[in-house]
Amino acid sequence: MFAKRKPEPAKRRQHNLAQFGLTEIPDDFDPTSGYGDDDGGDSDLEAELAALASGGGQRPKAKPKPKLMPTSDLDKMIADSLRDVSDDDDDENLENDSDLLGELHGIGGLEEEPEAEEAAAEPAASEEEPVQTFLPTTTVDTLGIIKQRLEIYKQAEANAKASGDSGKARRFGRGLKTLQDLHKQAAAGKTINVDDIPPEVSVKPAGDPSPAADESPAPSTPVSQPTRVAPAPPTPTSPPAATPPPAPATPPNPLVAQMRSRQSEYKAAALQYKRSGDTANALQFLKVVKQFDVVVKMCEDGQEVDLSDMPPPPSEFLEFLAKMKGEAAPEVVTAPEPTPAPAPATPPAAAAAAESMLEALQRRLEKYKSVEAAAKAEENTGKARRFGRIVKQYEDAIKQYKAGKPVAYDELPVPPGFGPLPSTEPAPAATPSLPTSPTSPPATASTSAGGTPSGSSATTPTVPRKAAPSPPQPTELTTRVTGNHQKSNLAEQQMKLLLERQKEFKVAAIEAKKAGEIDQAKEYLKIYKGFDSLLNAASSGLPVDLSTLPVPPSQRDNLEASFAIVSAEECDPSDDICEIGVRMEEQLAKQLMMCKNTRDHHKAMGDVAGMNRFENLALTVQKDLDVVRYSKRKGQPLPKFHYEKRNFNIVHCNTDLTDNELEIVVARGINYNVPNPKEVDTYVRVEFPLLNDESFKTKTNVIKDTNSPDYDERFKVDIQRSNRQFQRIFKRHGVKLEIYSRGGFLRSDILIGTVNVKLQPLETKCDIHDTYDLMDGRKQVGGKLEVKVRVRNPILTKQIEHINEKWLVLDAEG
């Protein structure tokens, strides 16, 4: 009934244990087998077991006990560990510390075998072992380069501190600290990357005006550093120190040497003036010395420097300043040249400065074109477009200059390194300035031009240029201060004109005094003194009205010479003097009425400023009218007068209306085309559109027995100016007026014609006043209707009326 269960087949493992990191067990492993079959080696195992059980086995060697340190040495070590030792003192002798080097080599895997140590320890008792020297991992060349750079940076920092350049001194100090850290690491045997070593800088020996020869930098290819160091052989105790290869020296920069030489001359001159008590000249020379520092730094950084603008020697500098200021040359005291300073070398030929406005514009145009081309080469489209606009601006300026048209020089940007544009006429040269680089112009120092109306202005030394003889002017010591700021040519021209006019009156006063005309000389002197306030205003940048300047004496003489002097008998007396007086009185009365009406109009509008303006004008006209009436009454000659053209801007406003009122005036009808013109009775219906399809409707009274009636009726409509829907009504719709003729008994009224008045003109005007043809659809039926529509102010803008008046003005008596 029940079948016997079949044995299951042995399952095979799908995975082996090796892939899980375990030892593979074979499938036929039998734990009971394997030991009984092995007959060899049992006696050896039993003997070993017996030896272990009896304790007769060989005992392991006992480790030697460490020697106990004496108590005195232990106290000394504790005191040394508690003492605060600076890092600099700890790292001074790391290079020759054999213990540390040995530990370093031990860490690197260079420990000696124990057998070698034991073998070396045995003969140590009999004879002293020679000292081994462990070599650092840093090569001798790298260590020598670091030491060499340390000396260079120390000297450069000292020179920078001596010259007062704090920024350069701080920079050299940071490089010196980096070199000191690298030197400590190299002495400790650490690997140093050559790229981490600060670059070499050019220094000059102390006390020598010319810079020392620049030493060539270290080789750019880094020296391959060994990862492991071979054990040092027991050779001599003091190995010879390897010296770094001498770096080839580069020739000195002649520009820096020349500028240093000239700077030392100015320093000596400033010191000489300071000792002699001349502080002003000492400060002047000291400012030039400061400018030299900026340009020397630019030259040392590799920027291009032009020596054409280098100041002259100190002996010629003050003389050049005196020539520019218009002072006498004998007052200039030449500065003594310092004896230790060598004679400066002659400067190389420099590019000639622009002598005319056209050349200056061309040079600036070429500069901006080169910058634009560089930007295009770099694919910097934004910069290229920006400089392209500047190039176009300069090209237009050159075209205008060639065509003789005025050019707005103030709007032209000035590239870095370029001074202000030269004026059209020779102007006083600027104070000598140091050469500037096209990339970074040096900052200018400000000084004061004493004794001149122009006040203080910035001075920078420039190349001395010969100036044409001109009247004494305030010394212009201003040059370009920022990239887009330069002095206005208009201001310079005004300044020059004022000085020339002042000089003319001074000369005229002297000549009048010599001729014995004391009163005339006093008058000219007063005018001469009055120019001081104008000069101060012009030098401060304020505009000056040149039309108010007094006429120079030379032009006065020419003006008087152009008229023929006649006697009273040669002139025919005029018979219409009384008529002229009457016309003058009428004209002044008309002007007075106009001023009063306009004053009242502005008062009704609430314009207080306009009211005051016309009030004052009315007072002036009233005074003139009183003078004319008084002269007529007393029989005196009429005062001198002249006519002027005056422009008045009057805001038109219907002040009798409010802002939310519109007035419709039906004035009259003109020649209606009706069959019975003398018996017709007419009236007008008015319809004005409002919001929400509503409308204002009214009608006039009936005018009987005429076809040209005078209605003269006014209707006021309330409007909403601020409502946009109501504003659209003014734009699209109009006032509808229908003219009716009253019918007889049992007859309805007859429509004569229709008039539509558009309201759109009220957006910009206050009034609509016109006559309109009567229409039947699109056909004219004959006759017209006069209509006027008014609002207080236009819907959108103010209505300003420009009035040109021929104004009668009485001359003031001198």
From Swiss-Prot:
- Region DM14 4: list its residue ranges: 495-553
Tagged with keyword Cytoplasm: yes
Outline the segment boundaries, as ranges, of region: DM14 3.
Answer: 358-416
Q: Where is the composition biased (Pro residues)?
A: 231-254, 414-425
Q: Report the Gene3D superfamilies cross-referenced here.
A: C2 domain
Membrane topology category: Peripheral membrane protein
Q: Where is the composition biased (Polar residues)?
A: 475-486
Gene Ontology cellular-component terms listed:
apicolateral plasma membrane; cell cortex; cytosol; endosome
Q: Where in the cell is it found?
A: Cytoplasm; Cytoplasm, Cytosol; Apicolateral cell membrane; Cytoplasm, Cell cortex
Coarse class of the primary localization is: cytoplasm
Q: GO MF annotations for this entry?
A: DNA-binding transcription repressor activity, RNA polymerase II-specific
Q: What InterPro entries does this protein's entry cite?
A: C2_dom, C2_domain_sf, C2_Freud, CC2D1A/B, CC2D1A/B_DM14
- C2 domain spans which residues? 633-772
| Residues in coiled coil | 351-378
Enumerate the residue ranges of region (DM14 2): 256-314
Residue ranges annotated as compositionally biased, kind Acidic residues, are 25-47, 86-100, 110-130
Its subunit composition reads: Interacts (via DM14 domains 1 and 3) with shrb; the interaction is direct and blocks access to the surface involved in shrb polymerization. This interaction may be required for the ESCRT-III complex role in multivesicular body formation.
UniProt free text on domains = The C2 domain mediates interaction with monophosphorylated phosphatidylinositols PtdIns[3]P, PtdIns[4]P and PtdIns[5]P, and is required for membrane interaction. C2 domains can mediate membrane interactions in a Ca(2+)-dependent or -independent manner; the l(2)gd1 C2 domain lacks three out of five asparagines that are crucial for Ca(2+) binding. The C2 domain is required for protein stability and cytoplasmic localization, and is essential for l(2)gd1 function.
- Function recorded in the entry: Phosphatidyl inositol monophosphate binding protein involved in endosomal protein sorting through regulation of the endosomal sorting required for transport (ESCRT) pathway. Required for full activity of the ESCRT-III complex core component shrb/shrub, probably by preventing its inappropriate polymerisation. Required, but not essential, for the efficient generation of intraluminal vesicles (ILVs) in multivesicular bodies (MVBs). Involved in a late stage of the endosomal pathway targeting transmembrane proteins of the plasma membrane for lysosomal degradation.
- Name the UniProt record assigns to this protein: Coiled-coil and C2 domain-containing protein 1-like
